[in-house]
Amino acid sequence: MKWIEVNTYDEMSEVAANIFLKQIQKKPNSVLGLATGGSPVGMYKELVARYQAGQLTFKDVQTFNLDEYVGLKRSSPASYWTFMHNNLFNGVNIKQENIHLPNGEAEDLAAECKAYDARIDAAGGIDLQLLGIGVNGHIGFNEPGTPFDSMTNIVELTESTRTENAIYFDDAADVPIHAITMGIQSIMKAKEIVLIAFGEKKMEAIQKLKSGHITEDFPASQLLKHPNVTIIYGGTN
């Protein structure tokens, strides 16, 4: 596991964007695993700027997002589908058919979970996976207690996670109770993983990860077993 400490959010975003830039330049048809929330916004802005500067192309890139809310329409301003288009996809030349997010509106959610993992496998697996980390150590929407061998599944969100995400909704009560998320084992199958975290609230989780204790009570700790993980973090002051 490689640790990179940064001084600012912008520096974190630039360092992470550089890793993704090099991946796409090395393999133009890369399969990328993407995340949502506040942590990756700056990195996506960097990637759009570098695309506009002619440094990379998304023409043959495929993307798979970690998660989506259950029961929220894709057209909703708070959906991760909308988030990804507003922050990245609308600013680059990615093909719509190469964009994949779990379908939280599927009639058969269990079948959608299996189909999502199958789509990732059919694409050749994820080359580079981006992660954030929750204050309780969740990755994707894999909350404490999630089995390490979990694949894409339906989860009930904890109160702390719903509170974290309430800023994206008009009312905290509007935050969905359930989500569809890539499981911890789904994430661990990625060839390379980059986790980004910045700010005082995230640092307690980073310190727990640094402790080296692996437990299902702290989902991100399973990353310690992955052979190719980079942690980009800062904001302790």
UniProtKB/Swiss-Prot annotation:
Its EC number is 3.5.99.6. The keyword Hydrolase applies. It comes from the Bacteria. PROSITE patterns: GLC_GALNAC_ISOMERASE. Pathway: Amino-sugar metabolism; N-acetylneuraminate degradation; D-fructose 6-phosphate from N-acetylneuraminate: step 5/5. GO terms for biological process: carbohydrate metabolic process; glucosamine catabolic process; N-acetylglucosamine catabolic process; N-acetylneuraminate catabolic process. One of its GO terms (cellular component) is cytoplasm. It catalyses: alpha-D-glucosamine 6-phosphate + H2O = beta-D-fructose 6-phosphate + NH4(+). The active site is at 67 (proton acceptor), 136 (for ring-opening step), 138 (proton acceptor), 143 (for ring-opening step). GO terms for molecular function: glucosamine-6-phosphate deaminase activity; identical protein binding. Keywords: Carbohydrate metabolism, Hydrolase. SUPFAM superfamilies: NagB/RpiA/CoA transferase-like. The keyword Oxidoreductase does not apply. Catalyzes the reversible isomerization-deamination of glucosamine 6-phosphate (GlcN6P) to form fructose 6-phosphate (Fru6P) and ammonium ion. PANTHER family: GLUCOSAMINE-6-PHOSPHATE ISOMERASE. Belongs to the glucosamine/galactosamine-6-phosphate isomerase family. NagB subfamily. This is Glucosamine-6-phosphate deaminase. It comes from Lysinibacillus sphaericus (strain C3-41).
